[in-house]
Amino acid sequence: ELIRVAQIADEEQFETDRILFEEGDYGDSMYIVANGKVRVHKGERTIVELEKGACVGEMALLDQEPRSADVTVNADTTLLKITQDGFYELMGSNMEIMHGIVKLITNRLRQATN
């Protein structure tokens, strides 16, 4: 699975305090934190901090709606960027990855409603 992700992802480096995207932005990619961490927030209110192995930005790929929150890099960070085309290719080629994405989104929705 990781090899397949690596084949379609682009590695990008970000410095501390870099804004990855803002609420309302068009979303055509998602990111996996390879190392470092990012903060998902609405204004100054932190929703969650994500570290190595976490995904961010996947919601906009699935529903094709604008980004629902701001994401800022909290430390020097390496992210793996997956475009929308690569995302759907990955989902279509591996049911385990599709199941994992659905589980991730379901868990985030549960956390948001509790």
What is the predicted function of each stretch?
Residues T46-T106, R110:
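Cyclic-nucleotide recognition modules
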Residues E1-G43, L50:
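Regulatory nucleotide-sensing modules
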Residues R4, E15, Y88-E89, N114:
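Cytoplasmic (intracellular) domains, linkers, and terminal tails of multi-pass ion channels
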